[in-house]
Curated annotation (Swiss-Prot):
The record's free-text note on cofactor binding: Binds 1 zinc ion per subunit.
Note on domains (UniProt): Consists of three domains; the N-terminal catalytic domain, the editing domain and the C-terminal C-Ala domain. The editing domain removes incorrectly charged amino acids, while the C-Ala domain, along with tRNA(Ala), serves as a bridge to cooperatively bring together the editing and aminoacylation centers thus stimulating deacylation of misacylated tRNAs.
Enzyme class: ligase
Gene: alaS
Binding-site residues for Zn(2+), renumbered to this chain: 564, 568, 666, 670
Entry protein name: Alanine--tRNA ligase
Enzyme nomenclature, EC number: 6.1.1.7
Keywords: Acetylation, Aminoacyl-tRNA synthetase, ATP-binding, Cytoplasm, Ligase, Metal-binding, Nucleotide-binding, Protein biosynthesis, RNA-binding, tRNA-binding, Zinc
Natural source organism: Escherichia coli (strain SMS-3-5 / SECEC)
InterPro entries to which the protein is assigned, alphabetical: aa-tRNA-synth_II/BPL/LPL, Ala-tRNA-lgiase_IIc, Ala-tRNA-ligase_IIc_anticod-bd, Ala-tRNA-synth_IIc_core, Ala-tRNA-synth_IIc_N, Ala-tRNA_ligase, Ala_tRNA_ligase_euk/bac, DHHA1_dom
Keyword Glycoprotein: no
Length: 876
């Protein structure tokens, strides 16, 4: 009996655990602290700093089943999903890793044992082919002489991409840095399927399928292209779970494995589809996986960056549901079946099921309102098309007006063999993107440029002043030996009391000083294991090796500590008041305010905000001790410690507890007791995205300042109303009632004046071919009274045509009224359009009543004078 996908995943992890590997949980789909990646797209992403030597783990062997998304940027599989056997937006990458431990021999032997042993995957050995890099004789000999694969099934692959080391069998992280050859294992499905072995002209067929890539990181590529051997070579491997499941379950398409068969049946059930071979079912089954897990990892639909990619995938799925005939919202209903089919890998998703479903439902409902109209517009444009390419401006209009991502438009066009001018679309988008860009802040983006080999020891939990030594200096991202007064730089110390930005808490400010220099620190950031002090040398000079005194801005740090501790209290209070579905989606803690983004599907009610505020202040009055303990990550989770969104944790973690009220994993700086916070005030609650709310709050002196400001405003209002704060509400109600009464009386007076004006005007009507024509410019009449006056005049004059105008604040207001017995000859809409055109405006309406506006008041007399001639011509 073949293994299920869940059993295959577990067997892989169990095998490598038996070989001394630490089983490491999948990291978030949002890469930690890596701006070069849109989404996690490989198993090695979470170990990148380990391979670069910037991070260390307490294990040298690891194995994972890593959730990955490829739907944006360089790795974008979106347009092929559903149309091929193996493309997905979401997939799981099985991997084993060696950090300077074993190398080629063991990596190859492990792979062969897992794939061919009767105890494990038991694949027929004769079905397996391998490739090696052309010059990697070591790997070739291991496969041939130790494993015993015949030479005809070992293929050397050279530089097949037009440059040295540019090969399918040579992996590199970038233009410089760790790199090395790789060996790939292929499975031969048999000669009943078209295709040739790797390296042959028919290699793109489906007969020979790559199932495992084993990368040997053995070189450090220099800027000049030279390859220096690494002192401790490493191994990074990746095997797509869906691909190996297809092989082990004896099917040729990933969409035929048990996991997808179950999901496709669920899609058919919620959409009403009956043809299980329909490609739209595949699209939706794939897309629910990426969408659900992205939302669970904190990504929300939006029009920027990761949120926009998520929105594109959701909307593509909704459109395919529409094609299948879905009559109501359906996509969110697939989260439950997905959790069931993912087994143990779906536990994180299950905890957030309600939140994920709500976000998907809201997004689908919003898009459904414009989908039909957008598709109709696209149909119209395609019907008019003379060539085979839809212009970029139309694609942009569909995006801008109807929320159609360009790839959804391309999807529709693809079904009709029409291309989309994506370059034209990008040009139309550029102005919007430019407006959306944010200023980068202080100086350059040092974090993207600086690579520090040294490590810094943080001692800021216990010290705000400390002596240290300069271990590195950077100017404009380049290492230098010394800096002089006036230069901006990043200073790295061997030890420091300065906290580097992390976990939502901003970096410290302060001063680095010595007998002959002073360096003003404006920010503190992490660079791998080093801590960089970003700022400007105010006086003197500073060089690598100098001793410095590092002084943190104590008052600022104190305010940050209060705000950070209050954030923990508020998080716990929100979960008590709103429910345990609340989880952190982002935070900012600085010296002025705390900002907290959390999952919740509706605006908080005033009484809920008050309840959270009261609960936090109650904990402050309890003056609970704030304690930290270092423990294993699993022990911390067992204790109920909440993890911060987007943070990466080591196996040993810092657990912060506030009595029995709050327990979280946190590396930030905090107050000693909750009583130190003094006072907590929420100053705003708002929405930031579908299913995400934001609270801003203040503490301590900041909270007291808001109390004083509120009191001052109340005193000012009381003074204006000649009352006091005790009876202020009654005073305001009284003033509002009096205002309403006066407004009512004023309106009555205006109506009386308009009626009188109408009576006076009726005598000025002239006869034009048996119809009474009245044209007049009025002064001192509100534009909204014109309609009432026209109705009165029509009643008085009988068979009539009326044009009234008034000017207020330089703007012209026009109205035309035509009695119904005349509308067959004169239509109010045409008449008002003729007049409005002359005063720089436009308007329209019914045949018997029409209104317009204009901007050229000076042209009004001539425009009104033209009415008589126009009407006379119509009445002849």
């Amino acid at each position: 009996m073949s293994k299920s996908t869940a059993e295959i995943r577990q067997a892989f992890l169990d095998f490598f655990h038996s070989k001394g590997h630490q089983v490491v949980a999948s990291s978030s789909l949002v890469p930690h602290n890596d701006p070069t990646l849109l989404f996690t797209n490989a198993g090695m992403n979470q170990f990148k700093d380990v391979f670069l030597g910037l991070d260390k783990r307490n294990y040298s062997r690891a194995t994972t089943s890593q959730r990955c998304v490829r739907a944006g940027g360089k790795h974008n599989d979106l347009e092929n999903v559903g149309y091929t056997a193996r493309h997905h937006t979401f997939f799981e990458m099985l991997g084993n890793f060696s950090f300077g431990d074993y190398f080629k021999h063991d990596a190859i032997q492990f792979a062969w044992e897992l794939l061919t042993s009767e105890k494990w995957f038991a694949l027929p050995k004769e079905r397996l082919w391998v490739t090696v890099y052309e010059s990697d004789d070591e790997a070739y000999e291991i496969w041939e002489k130790e494993v015993g694969i015949p030479r005809e099934r070992i293929i050397r692959i050279g530089d097949n991409k037009g440059a040295p080391y540019a090969s399918d069998n040579f992996w590199q992280m970038g233009d410089t840095g760790p790199c090395g050859p790789c060996t790939e294992i292929f499975y031969d499905h048999g000669d009943h399927i078209w295709g040739g072995p790797p390296g042959s002209p028919e290699e793109d067929g489906d007969r020979y399928i790559e199932i495992w890539n084993i990368v040997f990181m053995q070189f450090n590529r220099q800027a000049d292209g030279t390859m220096e051997p690494l002192p401790k070579p490493s191994v990074d491997t990746g095997m797509g779970l869906e691909r190996i499941a297809a092989v082990l379950q004896h099917v040729n398409s990933n969409y035929d494995i048990d996991l997808f068969r179950t999901l496709i049946q669920a899609v058919a059930k919620v959409t009403g589809a009956t043809d299980l071979s329909n490609k739209s079912l595949r699209v939706i089954a794939d897309h629910i996986r990426s969408c659900a897990f992205l939302i669970a990892d904190g990504v929300m639909p939006s029009n920027e960056n990761r949120g926009y990619v998520l929105r594109r995938i959701i909307r593509r799925a909704v459109r395919h549901g529409n094609m299948l005939g879905a009559k109501e919202t359906f996509f969110y209903k697939l989260v439950g079946p997905l959790i069931d089919v993912m087994g143990s890998a779906g536990e994180d998703l299950k905890r957030q099921q309600a939140q994920v479903e709500q976000v998907l439902k809201t997004e689908e409902e919003q898009f459904a309102r414009t989908l039909e109209r957008g598709l109709a517009l696209l149909d119209e444009e395609l019907a008019k098309l003379s060539g085979d390419t839809l212009d970029g401006e139309t694609a942009f209009r569909l995006y801008d007006t109807y929320g159609f991502p360009v790839d959804l438009t391309a999807d529709v066009c693809r079904e009709r063999n029409i291309k989309v001018d994506e370059a034209g679309f990008e040009a139309a988008m550029e102005e919007q993107r430019r407006r959306a860009r944010e200023a980068s802040g202080f100086g350059a983006d040092y974090n993207a440029m600086i690579r520090v080999d040294s490590a810094s020891e943080f001692k800021g939990y216990d010290h705000l002043e400390l002596n240290g030594k300069v271990t590195a200096l950077f100017v404009d991202g380049k290492a230098v030996d010394a800096i002089n007064a006036g230069q901006e730089a990043v200073v790295v110390l061997d030890q420091t009391p300065f906290y580097a930005e992390s976990g939502g808490q901003v970096g410290d400010k302060g001063e680095l000083k010595g007998a002959n220099f002073s360096f003003a620190v404006e920010d503190t950031q992490k660079y791998g294991q080093a801590i960089g002090h970003i700022g400007k040398l105010a006086t003197g000079s500073l060089k690598v090796g100098d001793a410095v005194q590092a002084d943190v801005d104590e008052a600022r740090r104190a305010r940050i500590r209060l705000n950070h501790s209050a954030t923990h209290l508020m998080h716990a209070a929100l979960r008590q008041v709103l429910g345990t579905h609340v989880s952190q989606k982002g935070s900012l803690v600085n010296d002025k305010v705390l900002r907290f983004d959390f999952s919740h599907n509706e605006a908080m009610k005033p009484e809920e905000i008050r309840a959270v505020e009261d609960l936090v202040n109650a904990q402050i009055r309890r003056n609970l001790p704030i304690e930290t303990n270092i423990m294993d990550l699993e022990a911390a989770k067992a204790k109920g410690a909440m993890a911060l969104f987007g943070e990466k944790y080591d196996e040993r973690v810092r657990v912060l507890s506030m009595g029995d009220f709050s327990t979280e994993l946190c590396g930030g700086t905090h107050a000693s007791r909750t009583g130190d916070i003094g006072l907590f005030r929420i100053i705003s609650e708002s929405g930031t995205a579908a299913g995400v709310r934001r609270i801003e709050a203040v503490t301590g002196e900041g909270a007291i300042a808001t109390v004083h400001a509120d009191s001052d405003r109340l005193s000012e209002v009381a003074h204006l109303l000649k009352g006091d704060s005790n009876n202020l509400a009654d005073k305001v109600r009284s003033v509002l009632e009096r205002t309403r009464q006066l407004e009512k009386e004023l309106q009555q007076l205006k109506e009386q004046a308009a009626a009188q004006e109408s009576a006076n005007l009726s005598s000025k009507a002239i006869d034009v071919n048996g119809v009474k024509l009245l044209v007049s410019e009025l002064s001192g009449v509100e534009p909204k009274m014109l309609r009432t006056m026209v109705d009165d005049l029509k009643n008085q004059l009988g068979s009539t045509i009326i044009v009234l105008a008034t000017v207020a604040e330089g703007k012209v207001s026009l109205i035309a009224g035509v009695s119904k017995d005349v509308t067959d000859r004169v239509k109010a809409g045409e008449l008002i359009g003729m007049v409005a055109q002359q005063v720089g405006g436009k308007g329209g309406g019914r045949p018997d009543m029409a209104q317009a506006g204009g901007t050229d008041a000076a042209a009004l007399p001539a425009a009104l004078a033209s009415v008589k001639g126009w009407v006379s011509a119509k009445l002849q």
